[in-house]
Amino acid sequence: MTTIRPCTHDDVDALVAINNSGYPAVPMATGEEILGLLSMCSLALIAENEDGTPLGFVMAMDPGLDYPSENYVFFESRFTNHLYIDRIVLTDESRGLGLGSTLYQQIFDRAKADGRERVTCEVNLEPPNPGSLRFHRRWGFEDVDTQPTKGGQVVVQLLQAPVS
């Protein structure tokens, strides 16, 4: 059985390991960077199996933060009432088992409870991440724009899904 719980500072090492295993789909991060992200998140969840082994996590942020992410800044310039998914990362072993959907259901439930109009995120087009794009399409995410980031090294598809 999988347990979903809020991330704590005690999870930082596991979050870094899972995060960095997802490169290049997500940017590499240090423990200090993950702690900084956690401090900005309105919702950060970690999934664990029966023996407490971390399987994945998701981090989401409310609008109005001083967060210099190019993608967050893009959404802030267009939407005022959104919940931004900064990242979702699953271990290789836990992909395809429905865990991403379990985490996203909690994101959408939170967005609805908080009166958000939409959930926003981005998916890499370059380097390509077709599995993530398919996943987001199944969740009703629609294209908003594309954007080169990191000096053109990464190109992302900026997405939004209405909260119903």
Mark where each language-model region is:
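A short beta-loop-alpha structural element at the N-terminal edge
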Residues: 2-15
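Active-site rim helix/loop that mediates acceptor-substrate recognition in acyltransferases
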Residues: 24-50, 59, 65
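Conserved acyl-donor/pantetheine-binding loop and adjacent beta-alpha core of acyl/acetyltransferases
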Residues: 59-87, 151
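C-terminal "cap" of GNAT-fold acetyltransferases
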Residues: 77, 146-164
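A short, internal acetyl-CoA/4′-phosphopantetheine-binding micro-motif in the GNAT/acyltransferase core
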Residues: 86-95, 125
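Conserved acetyl-CoA-binding loop-helix of GNAT-fold acetyltransferases
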Residues: 90, 96-109, 138
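Conserved active-site alpha-helix within GNAT-family acetyltransferase domains
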Residues: 101, 125-145
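Conserved GNAT acetyl-CoA-binding A-motif
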Residues: 111-125
